[in-house]
Amino acid sequence: MKMSKEKGSQFLLAEYVNNQSVWLNSQILKSSVQLLNEINDELVIEWISPLKQNDYREYRDNFLNVLGVSGAIPNDIWPKRGPVWDGLAKAKGNSGEEIILLVEAKAHLSEMKSELRATSLDSVIVIRKTFQKFRQRNGIDEKYADVWENCYYQLANRLIYLDYLNHTLNIKTYLVLINFVDDNTHVKTSLQDYLSHYKKVFHEMGISHLNLLNYVILCYI
């Protein structure tokens, strides 16, 4: 998939990745003590998408191949036509292992609202079963199920991928949520609004206690 907008989060992410990547990388690293400790001394983050030379292409089911990492998300965990990633990047760990960064960009709060839109009953069954197993395994009450499906579905499915990559495929993975503060290309959102919103989202999803959040990087630009 290709970026088409010339405003908002997609546009801003592409601008930073292609024109200010060193600065962008520093903002990501300073937002996560854990990643800073795990990345090697060169502190290099290599961006795979969205790149100008690739027409700002975004990737979907083949994202691991694009990152040069072996493995796949099986269809009994998530159906085909899974998440489209705003950005992909990778780095080397202290022992030479691959670290991958799955990136989502936001420029205003309404971008964070999402709901399950799968039309195939088989797909819906797989998604709900995967969500339910994740919640049970992590001590999350089923009273939050509706919020996962109808309010913050995008974040919920990103957490599934983050968990599977780290704990089943043993691929060191971070979910980087890049938030553009006071975006002057579209809709302005203050830092305080972002902070309050994420606190509210984590509470409403019942995930405030998750150790997996150590692999979620909230970056404000």
Set out the residue ranges of the language-model regions.
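Acidic, metal/cofactor-coordinating or nucleic-acid-engaging core segments within structured domains
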Residues: 112-174
